[in-house]
Amino acid sequence: MAFLSDTLARVKPSPTVAVTQLAAELKAQGKDVIGLGAGEPDFDTPDNIKQAAIAAIEAGKTKYTAPDGIAELKQAICAKFKRENGLDYAPAQISVSTGGKQVLYNAFMATLNPGDEVIIPAPYWVSYPDMVLLGQGTPVIIEGKPELGYKITPDLLEAAITPKTKWFLFNSPSNPTGAGYSRDELKALTEVLMRHPHVWVMTDDMYEHLAYDGFEFCTPAQIEPGLYERTLTCLGV
C-alpha cells in the first residue's frame, strides 16, 4: 500500500525551489550566478516597514487575528481597489492570506470537483497546474503565441472552453514572460467569457505595479462589469 495519497502523487516537486536551491549551492561554491528561481529582491526590507512591525509588536498586536484578516487591512484593500482599479468591494468580500499562492490553492480546493477544467495560458507560473491537480481538477493549457509576446487570443480561449470548464486563470503582467495585456486585448477576452456564464475568472494580479514603458494595467472585472460577480482577484498589497 502506498504511503502517499493518489492526489499528492499526481504533483511534482517545485521547480522554483529546485532552481533556487541550485543557485544557492553554486553561490556557496564561489561561482558567479544569477538566480532566476524565487522572486527574492536584492534589497533589504525598507526601514519604515521594519519600524511599523516593531511598533506593532511593542503595542501588543501579537494575538490571533480574524482568519480572513484584520478590519483595518481589509478596509485599506477596499480603498486600494476603489482608488487604483475603480472597483467597489465591501470588507466582507475581502480575504487576507499568507500569500498569493495560498489564495489560489484555497480557491481550487474549495471549488473544484473531479473532472472540472481550469484553463491556464502558457507560459505560466510553475505552481498553477499542480494546484489544480491537488484540487482534483484538470489543467487545460493554452499555448501563448510567440509572435504576440506569448499572449493568447480570443479564438484560442474560445476553443479551450468546454461544458466542464470551471475557471479561467489569468495572469497579467505574466510570470514568467512579463507580457501584459492591453485594454483592447483584455476586452476581447472578456467578450468571450461573457458568452460562457458558467466560467469563473481567477486573476493573478500580483505584478500589477511592475509596469513599464507606459503600460496601463487593467483587470478583467474593471474592463467588463458583467464579470464582477464571477471574478476572484488575487493581488499583493
Language-model segments: what does each one mean?
Residues 5-99, 106:
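N-terminal small-domain helix-loop-helix segment of the aminotransferase-like
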Residues 88-94, 114-117, 164, 228-231:
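Short acidic capping loops at alpha-helix termini that bridge into adjacent secondary structure
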Residues 110-132:
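Conserved PLP-anchoring active-site segment centered on the Schiff-base-forming lysine
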Residues 116, 137, 193-200, 228-229:
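A short helix->loop->beta-strand "cap" motif at the edges of active sites that frequently abuts
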Residues 133-140:
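A short helix-loop-beta submotif of the ANL/AMP-binding
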Residues 144-215:
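Active-site phosphate-binding strand-loop segment of PLP-dependent enzymes
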Residues 199-200, 216-237:
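Conserved active-site segment immediately N-terminal to the catalytic lysine
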